[in-house]
Curated annotation (Swiss-Prot):
Protein's gene: gcvH
Organism of this sequence: Acidobacterium capsulatum (strain ATCC 51196 / DSM 11244 / BCRC 80197 / JCM 7670 / NBRC 15755 / NCIMB 13165 / 161)
Keyword annotations of the record: Lipoyl
UniProt function note: The glycine cleavage system catalyzes the degradation of glycine. The H protein shuttles the methylamine group of glycine from the P protein to the T protein.
Family: Belongs to the GcvH family.
Cofactor: (R)-lipoate
Identification of the protein by name: Glycine cleavage system H protein
Amino acid sequence: MAYPANYRYTREHEWIEIDGKTGTVGITDYAQNSLGDIVFVESPKVGDKIEKGKVFGSVESVKAVSDLYAPVSGTVTAVNEELANAPEKINTDAHTAWIMKIELSDAAEAESLLDATAYEAFVKEETGH
């Protein structure tokens, strides 16, 4: 699996693309592949305050329900409304089917996240391949 080099990643398999003080958040291709067919996405609401490492929503698949963990702290500025009617878009392209956009409280928080190379190594270590 290829992971976009300009994204940062969590060990819980979320990604964030940073653009100035705004971050776009989704789940990784590894996560969607592990979950299987996604049937529902619970997103936060615009205006919600999100704290790094805390649950901000969930993804439900035919196999399981998985919590989503915030890669950074901030205020939700947008949610991907398309996922309400078509959550399977995450299965089609996990790295463009974003879940929320967030105005970062502290851009430095993203520096502690994994880059693409480190995330790929983490996945290999976790899966044993």
